[in-house]
């Protein structure tokens, strides 16, 4: 049984560029390694898993598993434990990347990783928090509990989409991070998800502490994607929580 599997959380608010950055890391992974990606989506119908698997094509050395329907440690907590166990004990990868939903609570994800069930099998490394510097102009983002928790538990802040930002926005992000988290938290700009593997292999500085309470999310425990399509050939699913709402459609390829 493999022990000390390196695991990184790649977090960030909605639209920060998490999936693009994970694809960049996968492109740079060693050819002889198997990686597992655990994707969590706020909506009942997963999009990020489809984006990752679609980009990878028929790639047997990357396993992508999904926990849909809300924060993986809230309503989907049981599903996360089952899926993480499957990754550790069946897949036994060389590395695990976890992408929580942009409305998720990564501190609770980290608490799960430190549970007795998993901790001897995992080597918990840096948490990468991705922030689009332009989002600092949006008060509904900067005041959101999920955004603040993502920043507070960061080991490294990635300023995404710098090609779309001006110098003042990049500087404002660095000053904002320093004022909230201190000057020791590094902030680096990365374009088009071009992350280096060197950003991963640093132990996390995270320590268990009081967390921001999660807002209950309306979500069925049963994964929507597993429901059979009716004769009409499509399903519609809705989910809401933390002030956001999603609507997803799943349509048969035959329709």
Where are these regions (language model features)?
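Short histidine/acidic/glycine/proline-rich micro-motifs that form metal-
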Residues: 136, 163-164
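Flexible, charged surface loops at secondary-structure boundaries
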Residues: 30-31, 151-152, 255
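C-terminal accessory "lid"/substrate-recognition subdomains
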Residues: 149, 165-255
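A broadly conserved amphipathic alpha-helix scaffold signal in soluble, globular proteins
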Residues: 107, 111-114, 155, 175-178
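Active-site glycine-rich loop that binds ribose-phosphate moieties when present
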Residues: 138, 142-147, 160, 171-173
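Conserved beta-strand/loop subsegment of P-loop NTPase cores
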Residues: 36-37, 96-97, 122-131, 151-163, ...
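Nucleotide-state-sensitive switch-loop elements of NTP-binding domains
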Residues: 2-11, 16, 20-140, 145
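Short glycine-centered, acidic/aromatic-flanked micro-motifs in structured strand/loop junctions
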Residues: 12, 100, 160-161, 251
